[in-house]
Structure formats: structure tokens, C-alpha cells
UniProtKB/Swiss-Prot annotation:
GO terms for cellular component: cytosol
GO BP, sorted A to Z: glycine biosynthetic process from serine; tetrahydrofolate interconversion
GO molecular function term, any single one: pyridoxal phosphate binding
Database matches in InterPro entries: PyrdxlP-dep_Trfase (IPR015424), PyrdxlP-dep_Trfase_major (IPR015421), PyrdxlP-dep_Trfase_small (IPR015422), Ser_HO-MeTrfase (IPR001085), Ser_HO-MeTrfase-like (IPR049943), Ser_HO-MeTrfase_PLP_BS (IPR019798), SHMT-like_dom (IPR039429)
NCBIfam families assigned to the protein according to its UniProt record, in alphabetical order: PRK00011.1 (NF000586)
PANTHER family: SERINE HYDROXYMETHYLTRANSFERASE, SERINE HYDROXYMETHYLTRANSFERASE 1
Name this protein carries in UniProt: Serine hydroxymethyltransferase
Keywords, sorted A to Z: Amino-acid biosynthesis, Cytoplasm, One-carbon metabolism, Pyridoxal phosphate, Transferase
Subcellular location(s) per record: Cytoplasm
Residue(s) carrying N6-(pyridoxal phosphate)lysine: 228
């Protein structure tokens, strides 16, 4: 990327960006919600479009001079609808959290009952956590996974739905490694007369490429982020049935947002265009393959994987048999250049600031070009540093640098 002007006008920020670039280049990024956007996406993000206010929607703006940004937003909408085959799309949400909030506010009233996945079982803050707006504004009832299988307990979902009669049921997760049965959840929604919303933020790319069943035929509303498996800019989007289009659009603007970020919407359009290409499907195929190899290799080292493995891009590792907390494992791995995040596991006994697990994912390393061989090396390194945590780890640190040197980012 060209930072010639920034290097002259603000050396402090320029230098920190260079340090972050070095960090990304020289570490192995295994945080499941992160990825590396293309140069094209970043160029759109850094364009003159950042200068334009465009409150409203294409052809219905509250500002003049929107002819060109109208074309961009229309392209983003058109491409997103083509990817997922949905009836209506809104590309203005600044984040996945705001996309979720807009859906709730579009058809529900504060205090209404909603069902969502328990955060410690793999759900998300915006699916009813009491510290989040969702849990403060609405009466959330949590469902979770079966204690033995660690898979979503659909019988429990149905039982809770019949008991609490929610106005909406939310599916989707931030740390669930298995296929979600949208058809079954839709049947439960229909049985109790609830709206069905799916937050596909983590698995949107897999759905786009055909590596996870789509929620679009079943859900009234589908929300997503654009920066995880879709490899776009940080932002959100909403898909919905046409009959809810006006309510959703009003919930975003003027409901919870003002002017859309047109430079971000342009970058979203670029990433949607990338997701429509054949090589994107090849990328997602490799993401899934890499996750499966990591699963197999980690099992060889006696790591306990929540639910026994993965069907998607991420794995949740239960570290209780390794006598180390998620917090300590995260710090230890970070010391050699492997970035993961501590994560609660189902039926967690430790604080969310400590945790019994770590979450790892393959989208970012796959974007770099890592394949099966690197996954084997990564699994070896994870095991090595945890087993030898009190030893000198300089050899492992050098190995991480060597692996990274094979696949340079942003050449």
C-alpha cells in the first residue's frame, strides 16, 4: 500500500501502521473472526468516497450529489443478492451488531421475548447477553448444546419455544463448529409463530461458496458481517424477505444510523464481486480442508475438541486436560507468534476473562496461502509450546517466522 503522504504528514500513525503490517506478516493469525482483505478492498476503503454524505437510499437521498454513490450502493446490493439469492438486501449497517439491532427493532418491541444461543455455548453478545443492548432491551431466553454431544440441542430449543412463546428465534454463533440445521429451527419457529433470524456472520463465506446450507430459504431475516469469511471491509449487511424490506430499511435509517459509510459500501461491493468468482470457491474449499487437517492433527496430540471436531472454518479447543487456561494458552502462543483468542466452552466453570478454551480458525491463514502441510506444522507448534511452556521457546518462535516467510502479505 502507498502511504507516501501519511509518512510525511503523520509519522506517528505511519510508523504504527508499519509495525502492525510487520505483526501481521510475521505472525500466524488463527483468530477465527479475522481475515486479510485484498488490496482492491483496501483501495476502495481509502478512496474519495469517504468525503460523501448520502443519508437515505439510492435515488431517495437527503443530500445532493449522490449520483455516483448511488451506483456503488446499487452494485453492492445487486451483488449481495446474487451471492445469496435473497429478495432484499441492505448494505448500510456499520457492523454486524448494528445489523442485528436493526432486525430486532424492525419487528419487535422492547421487552419482547427472543430466543438465542447461550454465549458460553458458542452464541454471540448480541444474541441476548445481559451486558449487551440485546439483553437489556429484550427478554432473551437462552438455548444451548447437549452436555454429552456438545451439539445444539434442538429438542431443548423446541421445548423452550413451546414454554416461552418467543416473538423471534435467533440462530447463528461465534464459536460453534458444526452445521446448523436451519430447516429444523424454522419448523420450531412456525410451530410457535415466531420470526426466524439467522446471524451468519461467521459462516457467510461458506454459505456463499456452497460449503454450508443456506439459511435464506428458511429465515425471515439474515444478518452478516462482511470482514470474516467474506474477506471484505469491517461492516455488516442484512438480507430479508421482500415483505420486511421497508421495516428493515427504516430500522437502519433513520432508526439507528445516519449517513452510510460510502467508502465502506464500495469496499463491500468489491468483496462481493470477489465472492462471485470461481477462485473464491477454491479458497473456501481450502479453508474447510485446512480446518479438518487441524482437527485431525490436534487429536493426535490429545487435544479435546468441543463437539469432537469441525464442519466449518473453526475449532473450539477444551484445554482442561492440558492443565492450562485459555488466557494462559493465548498469552503463551502469542509469545511465539501464533495469535488465538481465549474462549469459553460449553458449561464453562471459569471466568470469561480466564476461560477453559481457545478458539482457532483457518480463514486468515488460508488467504495467505497456507495449506495442509502448514496446518500440520501449526498443530505441532501449538502442542509443543503448551507441553514445553516452561522451556526456552525460541526455536518455536523461529519456526513461526520461517512459515510466515513462505507467504508474504501485501507484497
Amino acid at each position: 500500500m502507498n502511504f507516501d503522504n501519511l509518512a510525511l504528514t503523520d509519522k506517528e500513525i505511519f510508523n504504527i501502521i508499519q509495525l502492525e503490517n510487520n505483526r501481521q506478516n510475521n505472525t500466524i493469525e488463527l483468530i477465527a473472526s479475522e481475515n486479510f482483505a485484498s488490496k482492491s478492498v483496501m483501495e476502495a476503503m481509502g478512496s474519495q468516497l469517504t468525503n460523501k454524505y448520502a443519508e437515505g437510499y439510492p435515488s431517495k437521498r437527503y443530500y445532493g450529489g449522490c449520483e455516483e454513490v448511488d451506483k456503488i450502493e446499487s452494485l453492492a446490493i445487486e451483488r449481495l443478492k446474487k451471492i445469496f439469492g435473497c429478495e432484499h438486501a441492505n448494505v448500510q449497517p456499520h457492523s454486524g451488531s448494528q445489523a442485528n439491532m436493526a432486525v430486532y427493532l424492525s419487528v419487535l418491541e422492547p421487552g419482547d421475548t427472543i430466543m438465542g444461543m447461550n454465549l458460553s455455548h458458542g452464541g454471540h453478545l448480541t444474541h441476548g447477553s445481559p451486558v449487551n443492548f440485546s439483553g437489556r432491551l429484550f427478554n432473551f431466553v437462552a438455548y444451548g448444546v447437549n452436555k454429552e454431544t456438545e451439539l445444539i440441542n434442538y429438542d431443548e430449543v423446541r421445548s423452550l419455544a413451546l414454554q416461552h412463546k418467543p416473538k423471534m428465534i435467533v440462530a447463528g454463533a461465534s464459536a460453534y463448529s458444526r452445521v446448523i440445521d436451519f430447516k429444523r429451527l424454522k419448523q420450531i419457529c412456525d410451530e410457535v409463530g415466531a420470526y426466524f433470524m439467522v446471524d451468519m456472520a461467521h459462516i457467510a463465506g461458506l454459505i456463499a461458496a456452497g460449503y454450508h446450507p443456506s439459511p435464506v430459504p428458511y429465515a425471515d431475516f439474515v444478518t452478516t458481517t462482511t470482514h470474516k469469511t467474506l474477506r471484505g471491509p469491517r461492516g455488516g449487511a442484512i438480507l430479508c424477505k421482500e415483505k420486511y424490506a421497508k421495516q428493515v430499511d427504516k430500522a437502519i435509517f433513520p432508526g439507528i444510523q445516519g449517513g452510510p459509510l460510502m467508502h465502506v459500501i464500495a469496499a463491500k461491493a468489491v468483496c462481493f464481486g470477489e465472492a462471485l468468482k470461481d477462485d473464491y470457491k477454491n479458497y473456501i474449499e481450502q479453508v474447510v480442508k485446512n480446518a479438518k487437517v487441524l482437527e485431525e492433527e490436534l487429536k493426535k496430540y490429545d487435544f479435546k475438541l468441543v463437539s469432537g471436531g469441525t464442519d466449518n472454518h473453526l475449532l473450539l479447543i477444551d484445554l482442561t486436560n492440558k492443565d492450562i487456561t485459555g488466557k494462559d494458552a493465548e498469552k503463551l502462543l502469542d509469545s511465539i507468534g501464533i495469535t488465538v483468542n481465549k474462549n469459553t466452552i460449553p458449561f464453562e466453570t471459569k471466568s470469561p476473562f480466564v476461560t477453559s478454551g481457545i478458539r482457532i480458525g483457518t480463514p486468515a491463514v488460508t488467504t495467505r496461502g497456507f495449506k495442509e502441510e502448514e496446518m500440520k506444522e501449526i498443530a505441532y507448534l501449538i502442542n509443543y509450546v503448551i507441553e514445553n511452556r516452561d522451556s526456552d521457546l525460541s526455536e518455536a518462535k523461529n519456526k513461526v517466522k520461517e512459515i510466515c516467510s513462505r507467504h508474504i502479505l501485501y507484497k
